[in-house]
Amino acid sequence: MSTYQFIKCPKCGYEIKQYKNPTPTVDIIIEIDDKIVLIERKNQPHGWAIPGGFVDYGESLIETAIREAKEETGLDVEIIHQLATYSDPNRDPRGHTISTVYIAKAKGTPKGGDDAQKAELFSPTELPSPMCFDHKQIIEDYLEFKKTGKISRLF
């Protein structure tokens, strides 16, 4: 698999090597009491997911997490922990993403917005179906972390 392609400048014809790099994303496990917030996605792939999204240019991961939580759930969050980073090239059918997952606390009632048609509270041990991406595994890792303070598997 080629990790770069050549593109030509339309003005001068100079060939530029353009690298094909993974896209950085964040996911936010938002805790409200003993439940977590999940969104039902408006866009493909359809299903339930942890709120999150793509990092904008010039934005930190924490800023992205806070922005995405607000856009998709209407909630103001307090980031309390970085859980892990997930980098399986096949984790997202839209392309290779690398996601940093945060745990956050919030108060209030989630309301779907932006590309989330719904935002609802669920017990992390009773997830809706279908779950998108690798988010079922992320929630399993979250439960292990909540129980033991660590995650035993490597990514």
Predicted regions: what they are:
Residues P22, H46, R94-I98:
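Residue-level preference for beta-strand/loop junctions
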Residues V55-E78, Y86-Y142, R153-F155:
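Unchanged
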Residues V26, E31-E72:
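Conserved Nudix-box catalytic region and its N-terminal flanking loop in Nudix hydrolases
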Residues M1-D27:
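Acidic, metal-coordinating catalytic segment for phosphate/diphosphate chemistry
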Residues K35, V77-I80:
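Short acidic capping loops at alpha-helix termini that bridge into adjacent secondary structure
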Residues I28, I79-Q82:
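Generic preference for hydrophobic
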Residues I7, I28, Y102-A106:
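Short beta-strand element of the conserved SAM-dependent methyltransferase core
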